[in-house]
Amino acid sequence: MSQDMLSRAEKNASKASITNVKFVLSPITKIPLESESADCIISNCVINLLGQDEKPVCFKEVHRLLKPGGRLAVSDILAKKEFTEELKRDMGLYVGCISGASLVGEYENWLKGAGFEGL
């Protein structure tokens, strides 16, 4: 998220009189919010843009932020088999949220490793 996107989100929330939301500009792997402070965290085509080593860190951070019984809603593209190095480096596929796709099993392991249940 950029500062411009953050400003737009705040403006839209204000226009809609939404007051129970907080927008924070920070690295996704180290969010400056208190533990167990979020009821729901939504990610749309973001986590797959992280490097492979950052993805499990991201899920641990999200789990830390969620209140007991909180929900994580993720929309990401997952792969059934490993992409070739050429496909991983393809900028068009990266921008289209494809080249950063993780394997289904990896994703499930990262979520479980972070403490998520009921996948």
Model-found features: residue ranges?
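Short, glycine-/aromatic-enriched active-site segment of Class I SAM-dependent methyltransferases
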Residues: 78-98
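Short alpha-helix
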Residues: 99-115, 119
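A short glycine-rich, Lys/Arg-flanked "PGG" loop and its adjoining helix->strand segment in the class I
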Residues: 56-71
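A short SAM/SAH-binding and catalytic strip from SAM-dependent methyltransferases
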Residues: 39-54
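Class I SAM-dependent methyltransferase SAM/SAH-binding core
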Residues: 1-31, 57
